[in-house]
Design a protein with these regions (language model features):
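Terminal amphipathic alpha-helical/low-complexity segments used for targeting or macromolecular assembly
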Residues: 34, 40, 51, 64, ...
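Structural signal for interior beta-strand "rungs" in well-ordered beta-sheet cores
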Residues: 1-167
């Protein structure tokens, strides 16, 4: 436990944990084994809510997590509930996890990203810098959210959300390969993706297609996720037909006449 750190009563800190300087572990917080908490982090603060209960819930943090400088994690609103961080997560500088959030395993939340109350982030998701996730939204497994994205709907598993438009731009193929998924699995995921975003089917038909064509395997998670969404899902960013990326200005400047200096006298 580093210099000037504070550990309040009613806390549990597992073996092998490291608290750097100026860390505050507030009442109602449980840390599993082998967590490292960097300078200035505050874990277990009261929920930011207009009606703070006298006995809020807990913060439950698993094992092997890295919690960087000035991260804040707040307790749940209801006594029997908890804000949960799984195992082997990385919460980077200044990120915030609000009350009643559930963060899975191997999740990365980068600098200054904000998870509002009741947000669920599934395993191996990646939240880029300064992204903001609205209350009660869910981010699916192996989804990647781009920097400065602002999300008010659920992000399906395996997809990438562009930070500028806050819209889906395709599968997170790099993340899928890093997670060990082979090309056949990625092919199935791409087929399911096209059903969701490019088939033109009605919502009930999309769900039926996913249920019947992909009953097992990673692609089956699309049906499970979409059939339980309460907020709807993030739309796809569509490029107009025939559009291309302008690599440089195509306007050709008219050749300039050479300047002739005339000497008088």
């Amino acid at each position: 436990i580093g210099h000037f750190s504070i550990v309040e009563d009613n806390t549990v800190i597992g073996s092998g944990c490291t608290l750097e300087s100026h860390v505050i572990i507030k009442s109602g917080t449980t840390l599993g084994d082998d967590n490292r908490v960097f300078d200035g982090a505050i874990l277990g603060g009261l929920p930011q809510h207009v009606h703070i209960p006298e006995q809020p819930g807990r913060v439950m943090i698993g094992y092997g997590n890295t919690i960087r400088e000035n991260v804040t994690i707040h307790r749940a609103l209801v006594t029997e509930h908890a804000t949960i961080i799984g195992d082997n997560c990385l919460l980077m500088v200044g990120s915030h996890v609000a009350h009643d959030c559930h963060v899975g395993n191997h999740v990365i939340v980068t600098n200054n990203a904000l998870l509002a109350g009741h947000v669920h982030v599934d395993d191996r998701a990646y939240i880029s810098g300064a992204a903001g996730i609205h209350q009660f939204c869910r981010v699916g497994t192996l989804a990647m959210v781009g920097g400065q994205a602002h999300l008010v709907q659920d992000v399906p598993p395996y997809v990438t959300v562009d930070g500028l438009s806050s819209l889906v731009v395709g599968l997170n193929k790099i993340g899928l390969r890093r997670a060990g998924h082979d090309q056949a699995t990625i092919h199935d995921l791409m087929a399911a993706y096209r059903i969701i975003y490019r088939s033109g089917l009605r919502w009930a038909e999309v769900l039926e297609q996913l249920r019947t064509r992909f009953p097992t395997g990673p692609a089956a998670l699309f049906y499970e996720f979409l059939s339980t969404t309460a907020r709807g899902i993030v739309s796809e960013r569509r490029t107009p037909p025939g559009a291309t990326i302008k690599l440089r200005d195509t306007v050709v400047a008219e050749p300039q006449q050479p300047q002739v200096r005339v000497k008088f006298g």
